[in-house]
């Protein structure tokens, strides 16, 4: 029988509920409990798959092909547990399900209302995660801020939820902000008091308060919050701003978050084993020399658009005892100037995924610069497609080569639409999504990095390498180091006589974990270190 923890947020948005939920998951797992975490998002989109990265940040793809909120990436990285499409719920998906049931006559002609039908569907989704995962503890993060009209059905649903189970099977955690007023030199508790009052008004009494602050909270403040908010003083948890998100589990452990949560759930506070995590933080805080990595993208104004890529680079640098010196490079600025202007001093170049024409020629120019100047390079999804186009134009004597996505009239579509995508009209959830196998070719860098015959990687694309051009690429020096098991889809390519030049059709960043960096990212950083050592 699963226990349930609900994480809400107050005072301001983007307060770090996802990191708190993920950190609690890490702490529970370190005590031997199995955990699954789901996100309830209050927007009307069915999923974030068609949302602009500027609006939402990256789309995180699960093993079963769901396009989800980036917080699921945090959940997976912190707990090292794969989530599924059940772990991502939006208002849009809830309403869609309820309306479909109404159309099928599932409500027997009754009036369909927010209460009980919408809230009932939300509760059902939470129970479904528990049944599917069979986890000891289900952590649910409610998106938005207490007081937002969009979040009300979700808050009502988690209020009702305590009637579905025993009271000791549920714990409510409220993440809030304690602002520091410089002019008075005081930390203010009033916003938190009002946020808790708002929660109470809809029938939820938080069991724990996680208080974000950039100043330490003394016992007097904790006592004040305890009295006004109706929680035990031991359940007022200080959450100071951290130097890294990966240090948050350690600080919350010190504050007793996990111990107090287990106390409310009437579960044993087992011995906590965080030795590997502590070593990770030690390595993070004591790096070796810097590695200058250029991330050449089109959404660089919002770093969250490439969140998993950045974290994968960070994991690799921690493992290799290097300091990540990340350079955000606009592909459009390369088009306006030159690749050399922005990339001349970097040690490695990464070209991540994306869609559409904007900035593509800048990405292609960056790849050419990496190839010609022997700079370690890694291309992801569209990054691989751009690498194919660059080689076709500049080496394989196909100067007018392109992708049929970028130029439908190109005479040499070295990248073309997947056959199964030919008749697809809808955009949402219709790409090649989720985990697919890839067979690696012997005597290649890719095979050596993975040390496996068959790997499983997550995908999100509509276009692929055009096999009509495969032989001409092989003849001109390209190596295909990974394909689908039937050999039809090219998944991984590389170049010989280069320190490190690999590009993949899949998204390896989604499988990178702190303490277990992805082989392609680890290989990139190691190659950069080796090249620096040789040059010195």
Swiss-Prot record:
Signal peptide start and end residues: none
Residues binding ATP: 14-19, 71
Binding site for L-glutamine: 354, 382-385, 405, 462
Stated regulation of activity: Allosterically activated by GTP, when glutamine is the substrate; GTP has no effect on the reaction when ammonia is the substrate. The allosteric effector GTP functions by stabilizing the protein conformation that binds the tetrahedral intermediate(s) formed during glutamine hydrolysis. Inhibited by the product CTP, via allosteric rather than competitive inhibition.
Binding residue positions for UTP: 13, 188-193, 224
EC code(s) of this entry: 6.3.4.2
One GO term of the biological process aspect: pyrimidine nucleobase biosynthetic process
Enzyme class: ligase
Pathway connected to this protein: Pyrimidine metabolism; CTP biosynthesis via de novo pathway; CTP from UDP: step 2/2
Amidoligase domain: region residues: 1-267
Task of the protein: Catalyzes the ATP-dependent amination of UTP to CTP with either L-glutamine or ammonia as the source of nitrogen. Regulates intracellular CTP levels through interactions with the four ribonucleotide triphosphates.
HAMAP family from the UniProt entry: PyrG
Quaternary context: Homotetramer.
Protein name, entry field: CTP synthase
Classification lineage: Bacteria, Bacillati, Cyanobacteriota, Cyanophyceae, Synechococcales
